[in-house]
């Protein structure tokens, strides 16, 4: 089964809107169409972001109760990987390193994100992307809509 990692921004968007592609990605994980993979560090970041006062002011429906319910949903859908050794550095955005290291540790097929720095890993000229692709054959970084198209195409085969 394909292993997939969601960036924190995907969790935030899924928690904020049940009608968007990020939420549809989470639903696919809940349906068992792929294995959603997380680490303790990533779940801590997601919890912190969802409970930030500034985030909750921008997204009034994202109360602490909604955030906690969403986190329960994620933990029930996800598979935890421990330990996650620091095998790769990402100088362009060090905050993305936990996701890249989790991808290596889990042998992930995809990282789903809207983060430009991570999406640039898909570019052929990306040195970090090349290292990931050589370590994990078939590895891709996709935005949620592209990931949904990819998964739907695979399930139709």
Model region roles, listed by residue range:
Residues 106-110, 117-157:
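Acidic, PIN/NYN-like endoribonuclease modules and their adjacent C-terminal/linker elements
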Residues 28, 102, 133:
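Hydrophobic/aromatic ligand-binding patch that stacks against planar heteroaromatic rings
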Residues 73-111, 116, 120:
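Active-site neighborhoods of divalent-metal-dependent phosphate/nucleic-acid chemistry enzymes
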Residues 44-45, 87-91, 144-152:
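A short acidic, often aromatic-flanked loop/helix-cap motif at beta-alpha or helix-coil junctions
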Residues 31-35, 40-85:
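PIN-domain endoribonuclease scaffold, especially VapC-family toxins
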Residues 18-21, 26, 51-52, 124-128, ...:
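Short, glycine/charged-enriched secondary-structure capping and boundary segments
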Residues 1-38:
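Short, well-structured N-terminal submotif of metal-dependent ribonuclease cores
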Residues 9, 40, 115-116, 145:
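Alpha-helix N-cap/helix-start capping motif
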């Amino acid at each position: 089964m394909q292993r997939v990692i969601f960036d924190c921004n995907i969790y935030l968007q899924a928690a904020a809107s049940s009608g968007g592609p990020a939420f549809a990605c989470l639903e696919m994980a809940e349906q068992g169409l792929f294995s959603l993979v997380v680490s303790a560090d990533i779940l801590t970041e997601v919890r912190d972001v969802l409970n930030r006062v500034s985030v909750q002011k921008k997204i009034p429906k994202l109360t602490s109760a909604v955030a906690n319910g969403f986190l329960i949903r994620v933990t029930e859908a996800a598979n935890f990987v421990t330990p996650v050794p620091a095998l790769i550095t990402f100088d362009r955005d060090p905050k993305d390193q936990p996701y890249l290291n989790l991808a290596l540790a889990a042998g992930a097929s995809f990282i789903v994100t809207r983060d430009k720095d991570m999406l640039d890993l898909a570019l052929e000229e990306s040195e970090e992307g090349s290292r990931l692709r050589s370590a994990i054959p078939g590895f891709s970084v996709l935005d949620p809509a592209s990931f949904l198209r990819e998964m739907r195409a695979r399930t139709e085969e």
